[in-house]
């Protein structure tokens, strides 16, 4: 037997069943208020606390995480806050996120971790049962913009006896009497009011109203009053010509007024027309000829014997353009022929013969050759015919003219700049 004894041999053994002994690795807290500590100064981690009203703390200063705290009146503190309905503060100073609020507490009085009610409550104002979150109720009072909401019924029961005291930005309502002023004028569907008594923003009744008031464009002429009584800036209509118009009176009525364009001369039974016109009158008097001369293109029917003593404004022989005086054949005409006309032969002592050649100027006047001239030619009673030599002209012979001049006279036509200044000899004309 060794000095230390044999542990495997019979002998004295440690009494492990002694409950009063102290085990450094275990702690049998079977008694009430067992304050026995472990080798580390605290109960071992994970020790079950089954005592009523236990105040045992863990090694970290707080009850261990997940500790069963089902005992009544548990005052233990969790590191992450209470896990019961006890009103104790958590480690972060606010109830845990997602904690259920008490049933008897009103939702608006509950505050969240951010100082406001939790999300899901009426956070933008009072509840809808009390007021509108965006202002007042449209049916009872005005909107948030100072007027009732657009399209809202401002009057519960439309009636003609109820005055609309609400001013709208677009004028008064159409279903109430027009007691308010509209910037666009009064509405015209109210039959009880006089349409012409209301005023528009433009100074006159609106379009389509009664026309018994003055118009800025003149009086309307289709009223039931006497026609043409109102003065229009454009003149009156043709129903009454007694009023003055800036464009003269219409000629459908009596021509009592003067016109700036002259009066019409188509009046019946008026042989002596003394009315003057700025453009002339139609009384067969021409301002371009004197006496009984006609106007342009008109022929004078002279049935009496005349001596041709009327004067013309364009000459002393008395003719008008395009007029052929038909005088007596017994008298010799002293007038010149008109353009394009052939004067008849009124002198029986003169025998004329046509040459058959074309005229020099193309006016249709034929060249005449005198064959039998009696003593009347000496007195100057023969008329002048273009192309024939007169008694004042000297008789030229062919020998007196140069060869170049004879070629010019024998040619069918003259060339420009090569016309002789002397008449042709009678031998070339015959």
UniProtKB/Swiss-Prot annotation:
GO terms for biological process: mRNA export from nucleus in response to heat stress; NLS-bearing protein import into nucleus; nucleocytoplasmic transport; poly(A)+ mRNA export from nucleus; post-transcriptional tethering of RNA polymerase II gene DNA at nuclear periphery; transcription-dependent tethering of RNA polymerase II gene DNA at nuclear periphery. GO terms for cellular component: nuclear envelope; nuclear membrane; nuclear pore; nuclear pore central transport channel; nuclear pore cytoplasmic filaments. InterPro entries: Nucleoporin_NUP42 (IPR051767). Residues 45-68, 186-201 have a biased composition (Low complexity). Residues 365-430 are annotated as: Interaction with GLE1. Residues 15-36, 209-230, 237-252, 260-285, 323-346 have a biased composition (Polar residues). It is a peripheral membrane protein. Contains FG repeats. FG repeats are interaction sites for karyopherins (importins, exportins) and form probably an affinity gradient, guiding the transport proteins unidirectionally with their cargo through the NPC. FG repeat regions are highly flexible and lack ordered secondary structure. The overall conservation of FG repeats regarding exact sequence, spacing, and repeat unit length is limited. FG repeat types and their physico-chemical environment change across the NPC from the nucleoplasmic to the cytoplasmic side: SXFG/PXFG repeats are especially abundant in NUPs on the cytoplasmic side. This is Nucleoporin NUP42. The gene is NUP42.
